[in-house]
Each structure stands twice: as structure tokens, then as C-alpha cells.
Swiss-Prot record:
Part of the ribosomal stalk of the 50S ribosomal subunit. Interacts with L10 and the large rRNA to form the base of the stalk. L10 forms an elongated spine to which L12 dimers bind in a sequential fashion forming a multimeric L10(L12)X complex. Belongs to the universal ribosomal protein uL11 family. The gene is rplK. One or more lysine residues are methylated. GO terms for biological process: translation. The lineage of its organism: Bacteria, Pseudomonadati, Pseudomonadota, Betaproteobacteria, Burkholderiales. Disulfide bonds: none annotated. The keyword Ribonucleoprotein applies. This is Large ribosomal subunit protein uL11. Forms part of the ribosomal stalk which helps the ribosome interact with GTP-bound translation factors. GO terms for cellular component: cytosolic large ribosomal subunit. It comes from the Bacteria. One of its GO terms (molecular function) is structural constituent of ribosome. Pfam families: Ribosomal_L11, Ribosomal_L11_N.
Length: 143
């Protein structure tokens, strides 16, 4: 018989930097889960990633105080800012442009995000990434 699920916890944690302090500790502690066990497992799985890159994670908590977690790809906005070489988007995205990325960079981001996007094909995924970039004040060359 399957374990009884008592809840899901959604967090964004920097790769390789999970520790018992907020937001991880309180979120897991409320469900009675072993915080250090999660931190060690998460840090081990994010070892190959760029340190500090925010990674969305969905933790499934079970009634017997065990858990499983699924990591998603980093947010598109973080990848776009990294590709454009900017620290933050434009406060007026439709008038003030803060950077630019090429279509090739947008394709690379779309491939990295492909599992989490609902796009039918790569071209649709690239257009989704381009739309996110435009809403941040970053132009996409070649589209």
C-alpha cells in the first residue's frame, strides 16, 4: 500500500546551500521532517550545479515522517539575467532596455527549461523565453 501524503512543500533554495535556517528549517519542521537529512540529500544532488543558483524543489511529506523531493530547473528569469550579464531587470521594461541576448542563448535556456515548460516544441519554448526576457527589459536578437 502507498504511503499517506500529508502535504507538499515548495521552496526555492540556492544550489548546494541548503541549511536548517529559514526558509528550509521552519517549512520542514512544521511537518515533523528530518531537516538535516533533507539538507544533506539536497546539497548532494545539487553538487554539480553552479553554487548559489536558485533551484525550485517540491518536497512530498508522508505521514510516517519520511519525504521525497523533486528538483525543477532554475527559474527562467535567473538564466536570462545570467545570459544577458545583468543583475536585475528594467523597472520600465517596454521603454528602458537593460541588456540583450541572442536567439542562440534563448534556445540554450529553452533547452535547459524544456522539462518544466508546457511548450509543444523548441521554437514555442524559445518564444516563451523571449517573452519573459522582453518583460524584463531585455531584447532578444534574431526573433
Amino acid at each position: 500500500m502507498a504511503k499517506k501524503i500529508i502535504g507538499f512543500i515548495k521552496l526555492q533554495i540556492p544550489a548546494g546551500k541548503a541549511n536548517p535556517s529559514p526558509p528550509v528549517g521552519p517549512a520542514l519542521g512544521q511537518r515533523g521532517l528530518n531537516i538535516m537529512e533533507f539538507c544533506k540529500a539536497f546539497n548532494a544532488q545539487t553538487q554539480g550545479m553552479e553554487p548559489g543558483l536558485p533551484v525550485p524543489v517540491v518536497i512530498t511529506a508522508f505521514a510516517d515522517k519520511s519525504f521525497t523531493f523533486v528538483m525543477k530547473s532554475p527559474p527562467a528569469t535567473v538564466l536570462i539575467k545570467k545570459a544577458a550579464g545583468v543583475t536585475k531587470g528594467s523597472p520600465k521594461p517596454h521603454t528602458d532596455k537593460v541588456g540583450k541576448i541572442t536567439r542562440a542563448q534563448a534556445e540554450e535556456i529553452a533547452k535547459a527549461k524544456n522539462a518544466d515548460l508546457t511548450a509543444a516544441d523548441l521554437d514555442a519554448a524559445v518564444r516563451t523565453i523571449a517573452g519573459s526576457a522582453r518583460s524584463m527589459g531585455i531584447t532578444v536578437e534574431g526573433l
